[in-house]
Amino acid sequence: MAGADPPLPAQLLTQSTVPVIVGPTGIGKSQVAFELARRLGGEIVVADSRQVYERLDIATNKPSAEQRGEVRYHMIDFVDPATTFNAAQYVEGARSAIDDIIDRGKVPIVEGGTMLYVDALCDGFTLTGIPPDPALRAQLERLDATRLRERLLAQDADPGVDLHNPVRMIRAIEILEAAGPPLRRLRTRTPPPWTPVRMGLVASLEVIDRRLAERSRRQVERGLIAETQAALDSGVPENAPVLTGIGYAEAVAHIRGELILEELPHAMARSNRRYARRQLRWWRRDARIRWFEIEPDPLPGILNYLE
């Protein structure tokens, strides 16, 4: 896919459109976005809930130093991993970055796999657009109505939901955890001033699973355990959002003695396979996405589609 082709004219700017590349984890979105940015003279706005965190690079699949030296990236490496970061903060930062890129005469290219981030950035927030969080729901369902009410009101003093209905309160907390307060903001969709051109990368499940297995093995070989241990030693708690994500969660289990080294990459691959299928189900419902096969090379078709 790499080459020395000269940048293409930036016709996209005059049309107020922004290329958006989505797809399941491990499909190769980052490389395609990098090549597209080289051809269009663009900059990449990453839509990944874990790449925002500093220092943790391996299981978050951040772009390489060589890629960052050639193409400018936004929305990565700026949040302390011991803290939390929500979708509302992401949208604010990403929209600001896109405006700045356009103002400087460049082409912004959105690339990422975090479903909520992409949808909120391109469409504006909606209550129904925030997917369920089964783990959080299981935790909240153990609380009585009084404790649910206390937790909800601590996050949003005026949530606008029935404070005697546990089901409504659980859903409200779930949304607030993902998007941030206040809930009333999410009842009015605010789309961006530009038009997203949605493109998805796809392959057979066999190809996706093979890529995920290979990536998991490489991540362990690159030093995933040492990177995870360094984060823990620096004070990042085990339950920090970035360390509960795929790759780091399994590495933490290994460090605790709960998962043997030989099983580590297989456990990571299994978690990634489940996540990839969830991503595919989510995006296949969106008829606005134009799909491109990742093999042998989607870039020519993408360039032709954009022109």
Task: Pin down the residues of each PLM region.
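Phosphate/pyrophosphate-binding catalytic cores of soluble transferases and nucleic-acid-acting enzymes
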Residues: 1-307
